[in-house]
Amino acid sequence: MQLNGSQIFVEVLCEQGVDTLFGYPGGAVLNLYDELYKNANRITHVLTAHEQGAAHAADGYARATGRTGVVLATSGPGATNLVTGIATAYMDSVPMVAFTGNVPTSSIGKDGFQEAYIEGITVPITKHNFTVRRVEDLADTMRAAFRIAQSGRKGPVLVDIPKDVTAAVCEFTPKQPEPIRTVTTYNEEQVRWAADLINAAQRPLVYFGGGVRSAASCQPLRDLLHKAEIPATYTLMAAGVVPYGDPMNLGMLGMHGCYTSNRAVAECDVLIAVGTRFSDRVALNPKTFAKNATIIQIDIDASELGKNVDVDLSIVGDAAYVLNAMLPQIKPAKHPDWMTMIQSWQAQDYHPVSDPTRLMPHQVIGEVCNQCGPDAVYVTDVGQHQMWAAQYLRHTKSRGFITSGGLGTMGFGYGAAIGAQMALGRQQRVVMFTGDGSFHMNLNEACTAVSYELPIITVIFNNSVLGMVRQWQTSFYGKRYSQTDPHRKTDFVKLADGFGLKGYRCTNLPEFQEAFADALQQKGPTWIECIIDKDEKVLPMIPGGGDINDIIME
């Protein structure tokens, strides 16, 4: 059948199972938006306040579901406004397809109105990108973009579509989506060697990351831990893969991880790293990281093997396939001496002391867990509040904690929460944690949450400073607080009212308990401002370049 480019665009989106699209219209994408208008019953378009918010929403949608997030923006500034969101997804291996409009093909390279070379700009932050110069290539290019985003190590793909391509006509043939390509092969001898090392270990430890968030990987990982009594620690991106309360779960590792996890890495004799890249927030000193251990690394991306830390055995493959192949070769085991050592370290873990005269982050987060139960999805911005959420939430679901890890994007949270809420439905509870610094970055997305009546509860930790940077200035820069006290006078309760949502302000725990309970009853979005002390710290902390011997506990 004969279709124009805009019709092909919609048909392929539907063919690929896209039900929700985040974006912002503009001149170069008017033809696409006209077709989306005609097909509003097939694809829900979510209009955000800013293209960056749309990109983060597509990201949040993908993280909450595992499906590909889709974002659409016009040419020039519309496209460049996506860059931070695309880079955020790239660093955390999130499947996303970003569509951008462009000037007509005859005008490319002539510095026309709202022209930007977005293909070149995004080369370092995408798995692949395309510029479609012929309408005949549009359908298969879009299909390739979705396939690439989900295949192997997941990530964002950009498709740039000049305006004339959206109007041109060609023959279109519908196709079934191709199966997702994953790495099903692995070196069987390496897997046997890994199993032998694990079976011989006296102090084994599993260290896992975001590469095991899929349901297919979670269960074999848990089976490995319990079959051979192997304790485990995880990165920020993997919270919830092994549930809170599991006796094998030692807690988060790294700069703001717990004492036990960091000590266990230093003392283990075999470290099994699964779906993780030894980032500099975990392996703060690559030369001393797990220095007593034989290190096994399993990763779907061969380029990550041994990149940041020298490893003794590397296995290329999908974690689910490798772990399932390894499990029958693992002998049931107990490690009583090792577990006794770990229990002694757990007695030394940092536990904040509550102060009844003020509101403290661990109290707030604990109360959120009490009132929400195990099924809520939590989203964060970036800063101290992000680490407090990672430390104190009772993570139980592999996709229940959504945060920007690799890029550390302030302003990520509200857009991502909108995407997660749209993906999961209004009956699913989504709570977003932010700080007054991060929230100022993209709080304009409140109008999006209001427009779509999304019942997102936003908890704002307000210490009136840029807390994480200020903490570093306190510890390492002689308390010289350069530009971390912005002296802002924002009244978040009044601002909430201006956006058309309900706002609360709390200075103690009973006030927060009452406010959160009321927020749970609201049909639309709410903000709860929590006034906390500006000297509140994220502890423990290991300085950059340090190790367990440098940990700060007070």
Question: Predicted segment positions?
Answer:
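Active-site nucleophile and cofactor-binding loops and adjacent substrate-binding regions
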Residues: 24-26, 45-56, 71-78, 133-134, ...
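N-terminal alpha/beta PP-like core and its mobile active-site loop of ThDP/TPP-dependent enzymes
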Residues: 1-333, 367, 371-374, 429, ...
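Well-ordered beta-strand positions enriched in small/hydrophobic/aromatic, beta-favoring residues
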Residues: 69-71, 159, 378, 401, ...
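Phosphate/pyrophosphate-binding active-site segments
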Residues: 136, 174, 292-384, 509-513, ...
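Thiamine diphosphate
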Residues: 99, 107-109, 113-114, 306-308, ...
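Charged, low-complexity, helix-prone segments enriched in Lys/Glu/Asp/Gln
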Residues: 61, 80, 337-354, 420, ...
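Active-site diphosphate/adenylate-binding microenvironment
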Residues: 9-10, 14-19, 27, 32-37, ...
